[in-house]
Amino acid sequence: MINIEHVYFSYHGDREILKDVNLEIKDGESVGIIGANGVGKSTLLKLLVGIEYVNGGKIEVEHTNVCKKNLTQIRKQIGYVFQDSDAQLFMPTVLEDVEFAPLNFGYSKEDARKLAIGTLESLNIPHLRDKSIYHLSGGEKKLVSIATVLVMNPKTIIFDEPTVGLDPKNRKIFIDTLNTLNCTKIVASHDLDFILDTCTKCVLVSQGQIKAVDATRNILTNQQLLEENGLLLPLSIHR
């Protein structure tokens, strides 16, 4: 369970990026966060994992306040898949990247390796284990990025613009993978068709505030609501 209550945020005292944001995300939900550029979607994700901290209000993950003193506990429960996979993959090989988190959290080398291999197998990419990240396709990098997070078995995984740079084939593989993950998923994306395919609940953000929370199809078929907030209907709805 994630509770966001009366959250305000600004960078270095500048204009407010988020204003009185309230949201509850239940265990097991697949939640899409949508909105035009610069409305605060990515900022909200960063607040959830403690990359940034609220200026006012509070965020609780499993009844634990997201703050510096609780950061290790929070990051055991929430995984974050960056928009740019290259920012997340930095070890010489795929296997070393995936076992990095368990090692960092105190697992033995043997146990970390077992977890890493098992995670790669669960995503059907064990053949990539000894490859350099520089020899991976965009789709492969995205799957390995998921593996680096999934290896710790978090209750929640956050995805920031996950389809950026994916061709149609790898996009389909990624959608299929996402839909098999047995955890809470929070996805921020401009790809509204992707949100429609992967999320059952949708949150519309505009000018730093939540304008609507509803079933995904209810929001993404509401042309007036979308256009009022700088968005267009998903392509699949036009067909």
Task: Give the label of every model feature segment.
Residues 49:
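Helix-to-loop junction immediately C-terminal to a conserved catalytic motif
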Residues 110-128:
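Conserved ABC ATPase "signature" region
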Residues 132-136, 140:
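Conserved ABC ATPase signature
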Residues 189-190:
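H-loop/switch region of ABC-family ATPase nucleotide-binding domains
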Residues 195-197:
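A short, surface-exposed alpha-helical micro-motif characterized by mixed small hydrophobic
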Residues 209-232:
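Conserved beta-strand-loop-alpha-helix hinge in the C-terminal portion
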